[in-house]
Amino acid sequence: MLDTKFDELMEFPASFPFKIVGDASDTLADRVVAVAQSLAPGDYAPTTKASSKGTYNSVTIRITVTSKEHIEKLYTQLAAIEGVKRVL
């Protein structure tokens, strides 16, 4: 797992924003929501923004997390989505 200090800095459960940057794709937001649903079922309304040249899309989604391990698992699973370049 990742070596983070979320457990020292946050109280759980908490609403946590994730920003996923990936190749421009009409399905990126759907794939992000699918991962979120698999690890933290909920009603999600992500926002999507295209880069100035249209090469990349960023998807921002707020997910209710329950622990440090939950955040780390989400980061790992979101980063594994095909076409994803960064998870912030």
Swiss-Prot record:
Tree of life domain: Bacteria
Gene3D superfamilies, sorted: 3.30.70.260
InterPro entries documented for this protein: UPF0250_YbeD-like, YbeD-like_sf
GO cellular component terms listed in the entry, alphabetical order: cytosol
Family: Belongs to the UPF0250 family.
Protein known as: UPF0250 protein Spea_3154
